Amino acid sequence: MTDYRLWSNTNTTNTCDDTMMMDSFLSSDPSSFWPASTPNRPTPVNGVGETMPFFNQESLQQRLQALIDGARESWAYAIFWQSSVVDFASQTVLGWGDGYYKGEEDKNKRRGSSSSAANFVAEQEHRKKVLRELNSLISGVQASAGNGTDDAVDEEVTDTEWFFLISMTQSFVNGNGLPGLAMYSSSPIWVTGTEKLAASQCERARQAQGFGLQTIVCIPSANGVVELGSTELIFQSSDLMNKVKYLFNFNIDMGSVTGSGSGSGSCAVHPEPDPSALWLTDPSSSVVEPKDSLIHSSSRDVQLVYGNENSENQQQHCQGFFTKELNFSGYGFDGSSNRNKTGISCKPESREILNFGDSSKRFSGQSQLGPGPGLMEENKNKNKNKKRSLGSRGNNEEGMLSFVSGVILPTSTMGKSGDSDHSDLEASVVKEAVVEPEKKPRKRGRKPANGREEPLNHVEAERQRREKLNQRFYALRAVVPNVSKMDKASLLGDAIAYINELKSKVQNSDLDKEELRSQIECLRKELTNKGSSNYSASPPLNQDVKIVDMDIDVKVIGWDAMIRIQCSKKNHPAARLMAALKDLDLDVHHASVSVVNDLMIQQATVKMGSRLYAQEQLRIALTSKIAESR
C-alpha cells in the first residue's frame, strides 16, 4: 500500500499568484463554520499529554482504512461525510471529512467505458492535467514538461479514482442526496445494482453508476455519515454496519484497532477523558503494513506555548466543522511559482490515503492538519481578543499532502536545532476579533394549529410545500382518465379538457331532462283528455277493455334496448307494440310473445336507428304510442 504523499526537499514559499490561486481553490474564510470555542486550559511548558484526541485526522484516517482493509468485501473507497452547522438558523450540512481510496481488485475494471479510443485518451489527458496542476498548486512546482511532473502522473486515472476526487467538491444538506437521507432518517441506505443506481433520484448515485460503481452504502454515525463504494455487487451485511457503528464511535482509541486481510477485525476500547480536557496533539507517525493489514499508530503530544506580556502560558482547544469547495477545472499558471527539484505526482494510486483540507499562505515540506482550526487566546487581560494559529511543519525527508476539513493541530515553537533530522515547528499568530453570536429574535404571531408542525426554516417550509403540491398532482393524475404525458403542464391541460367535457355532458343532460319533462306534461294532458272523452262516449262496460294494468320495462345499453311488456291479451297488444316500434324507428332483432291465461308477456330486443333514446325517454314514448294505438 502506498500513501498519497508529497515528497519535498526544501521549504517553498508561494508567491502572490500562488496565494491568489490557493484562495480560489480552497475556501478562504472558514471561520463562519466554526462553533463557539471551549474554555482555555493552561499547560506547563515541558508537559506532555497522555492521550490522543478522540476525533482527529490520524484517528479518522485509520478508522476508514481499518474498515476497508478488514472487510471481506472488495470496497473501492470509503468517505466520511462530516456533519456541521453553517449558522444558527440553518440545517446540518454534510461536507468532506476524509477519505480513503483502495482501488479495484480486478485490474481489468480500471479502464473506464469510453465511446472511442480518442475520447478515452482526451479524457485521460484532462484528468492528468488537473492532477498535475493541483500538484503544482500545492507543492509550488509549476507543471511543465521539463521538471518531471509529466512522468510522475503517467498511469491512467480510472473512473473510480476520478469519482473519488470530485467527491471532495460536494456537500449535502440534511435530507438531500444519499448521505443526507441517511443522516436525516438515521438509518443506513444500501443501493446495489446499476439499474437501481441509474433509477435513483439522487444525482450522486446516478453519477456513480456512470463511473462504473455497482454498490453504494451510506451508514450514519454520531458525527456524520460513512459512505462506501464498490465496482462489484455487494449485498446488505449487518457485520459491516456493526463495524461502522463501532469504528466511528470517536470515544475509541484507534491505537488498538487492528484489521486482517481475511475479513476479521478486532478493536480494543480504552476509556478516554472528557474531550474538553484533552490537549492538542501532533501525531508523529502512522505506519500501515499491507501484508497483514495491521495498523500501528504512535503519537507524541506537543503542547502549545505562547508568551505574552505577562509571560503566561496559555492554550486554547476547540473544534469546528467546515466545508470546502474544490474546483477541478483548468487553472492557468505563470512562472512566478518556485520550482522543486523533482516532479511530484498528485494522483492517488491503488490503496492510497488521500486527504484534502485547509492551507496557509506559506507551505513547508509537510503541512500537519487535523480535524478543525485552533484558536489561541492572546491575553486574559485584553478584553477577550483572540488569535488564530495555523501550525506547519517542514520535513526534509517526507512531506504529506493533506487537505482536511476539520480541526487544525497547531504545533509549538519550542527550541529545536535547525540541523535536527526532525521537522522544525513554526506557529503564526493572527489576531482575530471576537464574533459574538447574534441572539435570534423571538417570532411573534399565532401558534400553528393543533397537529400541524411549524417548519424549522424557509428551506423546510419550501420542501413541505413541494411535497404537498406533488401529492395533489398525484391525486389529480389518478382521476383524469386520459393522460397524454406525465409532466405537470400536460396533466393540467388534460384535466382542464376533462372538466370541460364533463360540463358539456351536464348541460346536455339538463336539456334532455327539460325535454322529458315537457313531453311528460304533454302526455298527461293527452291522456287526461282521451280518458274523459272515452268515458263520455263509451259505456262503462267498455272501460274494462282498455289496457289499464300495462307494465313496460325498458333497459338501454348503448344503441341497443331490451323491452318487456306485461298486459292483457285483449285488443291485440302485440300488433300495437310492433306499430310503436315502427313509428320510433327501432329495428327488431328478437321478439317473443307468451300468453298465460288472460295475461300476455312480450319481450323484444331492438336497435335504435336515427335517434339515441334514454331509458326513461324510450319507456314514455312506447307508453304514448301504445296508448294512441289503443
From Swiss-Prot:
Database matches in SUPFAM superfamilies: HLH, helix-loop-helix DNA-binding domain
Underlying gene: MYC1
Helix-loop-helix motif: annotated span: 467-502
Protein function: Transcriptional activator that binds to the G-box motif (5'-AACGTG-3') found in a number of promoters of jasmonate-induced genes. Transcription activator involved in the transcriptional regulation of terpene biosynthesis in glandular trichomes. Binds to the promoter of the linalool synthase TPS5 and promotes TPS5 gene transactivation. Acts synergistically with EOT1 in the transactivation of TPS5. Involved in type VI glandular trichome development.
GO molecular function: DNA-binding transcription factor activity; protein dimerization activity; sequence-specific DNA binding; transcription cis-regulatory region binding
Entry's Gene Ontology BP terms: positive regulation of DNA-templated transcription; regulation of DNA-templated transcription; trichome morphogenesis
Cytoplasm in keyword set: no
Domain spans labelled bHLH: 453-502
Biased composition range(s): Basic residues: 440-449
Keywords of this entry: Activator, Developmental protein, DNA-binding, Nucleus, Stress response, Transcription, Transcription regulation
Signal sequence annotation: none
The protein's name in its UniProt record: Transcription factor MYC1
Biased composition (Basic and acidic residues): 450-463
Stretch list, region Disordered: 356-398, 430-463
Expressed in which tissues: Highly expressed in trichomes and at lower levels in leaves and flowers. Expressed at low levels in roots, stems, leaves, flowers and fruits.
Induction comment from the UniProt entry of this chain: Induced by methyl jasmonate and wounding.
Null mutant phenotype: Altered morphology of type VI glandular trichomes. Strong reduction of volatile terpene synthesis in trichomes. Strong reduction of the expression of terpene synthase genes in trichomes.
Outcome after substituting residue 161 to K: Enhanced transcriptional activity
